[in-house]
């Protein structure tokens, strides 16, 4: 498997099926949909994933503001949109995670492989960050949101100083310290 992963054969890539259905079929319950059952059967044979969604509903959701979107999803018995679920499933299937960096002018998400250590994650931003890595100041996204600011999070002792062996976690908010 390790040798084949270097070749990048299309037939050896992980697969997830996005099963698009009408809004009526989606609303009435996906398990009663014969087309969805057929896709599930194929996916099971191929050891692939299946994600049911409705492109028509997704198109409507994109046009909504945050509050309206949350109400709409709750009425449908969903916690998140199909697009959000598809992105999460694809990240999981490919073994990817995201971490965030935040400055005065920009907040940015960076995609890395699960299991990446802090210096290599810093290298995604710039090779100098990896080469001169000193430490990473890290806080979980949810903790930062709960505190309201990095300053408040530091006062509560929630910002950790991590070294070269720190394995990045999905949702980490990071400030890399480096010297070149």
Which residues does each predicted region cover?
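C-terminal-of-GTPase-core extension/linker across diverse P-loop GTPases
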Residues: 1-169, 174, 179
